[in-house]
Design a protein with these regions (language model features):
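A late C-terminal transmembrane helix in Major Facilitator Superfamily
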Residues: 319-348
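C-terminal transmembrane helical hairpin of 12-TM major facilitator-type secondary transporters
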Residues: 263-307
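Structural signature of the two symmetry-related core transmembrane helices
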Residues: 65-79, 161, 265-280
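Helix-loop boundary and gating motifs at the non-cytosolic
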Residues: 1-43, 200-230, 237-240
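Symmetry-related core transmembrane helices of the 12-TM Major Facilitator Superfamily/SLC fold
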Residues: 155-172, 355-372
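Cytoplasmic helix-loop-helix junction between adjacent transmembrane helices
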Residues: 92-133
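Juxtamembrane intracellular "pre-TM" segments in multi-pass secondary transporters
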Residues: 177-206
Length: 380
């Protein structure tokens, strides 16, 4: 619960940034390809660097150091309000994702230990649900600031500094509260050189292909900005992101409970739903963008809860930090390819039919790989 509150406060800041960054970059004159590239590189760094931070956390047992460094880098989001340079904004977007890479494996390992006996699906689902409260409040607050400041991106982004300071304060209090519990359990668990199972690699490959075929939210919002600009309604873009988070939050909680009953085969549902964002994005006008946001929110809610929960069920605790690192590298690589490919296809006006064919092929491969994954519950 405490880590969920910290994540909630973090989400108020960084999800606000993720909701407005495509809008801001479009306002500064950036192409769809560069927005997709920035999103892709950010996710590749954000997920790929976990391959380093995860094993380092396992071997050094310095979980809290990585957590503090990672949350500290969220300061990149309000700092975006201090510049109107396209390239500097792109760098700050990527820097925030680096922070995500540093904190996430250690945070997930801490959550998996503290929630022992609760059920991995429920634990990660509950954490994500609390998390998403901030993910809704943040973009909504930023949207209201955009209205109040008459679409002033700089002042709106700088208004996030107080939330950042509050988050760091609560993180310190959380550390003081649960450090002893985590350390006591950690001393009973040592890192191991046991190889990760074939089922884990099949599962990671399935997630890779799933993300390759999922249209990035940054480009869905970019399309929204293009539609809304003519009416001077760029302030609406953060509220489109609020729609994503409003769907994401309950879906994370519900899917966590279903996953605990059905198991990994339930992941076939978000894989199939991943086709919908591109279908709806091909529709003309704002309604298509709204439907694409809803569809993306359904997938995201499951991606951020049960995708991680499946790793917990496949991998023993001593290798879990490393496993999250490898798993997230696959997730990041898939998101990078997705951002570049979809951004390019939007810029050169590839036909919606061809884009849909690409998505369907990717999701079929993902489902086939998923069928080869056989999670094995570990007794801890």
């Amino acid at each position: 619960m405490l880590m969920g509150v910290v994540s909630m406060l973090g989400d108020i800041v960084y999800e606000s940034g993720r909701g407005i960054a495509p809008d801001y970059l479009y306002f500064l004159g950036t192409s769809a390809f560069l927005v997709g590239l920035t999103s892709g590189i950010g996710e590749l760094v954000g997920y790929g660097m976990r391959l380093v931070s995860g094993p380092l956390a396992d071997r050094s047992h310095m979980y809290w150091l990585f957590i503090f460094l990672g949350y500290g880098l969220i300061i990149a989001i309000p700092m975006m309000g201090l510049t109107n340079s396209i390239w500097l904004v792109m760098i700050l977007v990527i820097a925030e994702r680096l922070g995500k890479a540093l904190r996430s494996p250690s945070r997930d390992a801490v959550v998996s230990v503290v929630s022992k006996g609760m059920g991995s699906g429920k634990a990660f689902g509950l954490h994500e649900f609390i998390d998403q409260i901030g993910a809704v409040v943040g973009p909504a607050f930023l949207g209201l600031m955009m209205i109040w400041t008459a679409n002033n991106f700089s002042l709106s982004l700088q208004s996030l500094f107080p939330f950042y300071l509050l988050m760091m304060g609560v993180l310190y209090l959380t550390y003081r509260r649960i450090k002893g519990t985590v350390e006591e359990i950690r001393r009973q668990t040592t890192a191991t050189n046991e190889k990760l199972s074939r089922g884990f690699w099949m599962y990671s490959g399935a997630v890779l292909m799933n993300t390759v075929g999922l249209m990035p939210i940054a480009l869905i919002l970019y399309n929204g900005a293009k539609i809304l600009e003519s009416g001077g309604q760029l302030w609406l873009v953060p509220f489109l992101y609020v729609i994503v988070q409003l769907v994401d939050a309950p879906m994370a909680l519900v899917s966590g409970y279903i996953y605990d009953k059905i198991g990994i085969k339930f992941l076939g549902v978000p894989f199939a739903l991943s086709i919908l964002p591109i279908v709806f994005s091909s529709l003309v006008g704002l309604p298509g963008v709204i439907l694409a946001c809803i569809a993306y929110g359904l997938v995201l809610g499951m991606q951020e809860s049960i995708y991680r929960a499946a790793v917990t069920d496949i991998v023993p605790l001593g290798r879990r930090g490393s496993a999250y690192g490898f798993f997230n590298l696959m997730l990041g690589a898939g998101t990078f390819v997705s951002g570049v490919v979809f951004g390019y296809m939007l810029d050169v006006l590839v036909s919606p039919t061809l884009m849909l064919d690409f998505v369907i092929v990717a999701q079929v491969i993902a489902i086939v790989l998923l069928l080869g994954a056989r999670p094995k519950k570990e007794k801890e």
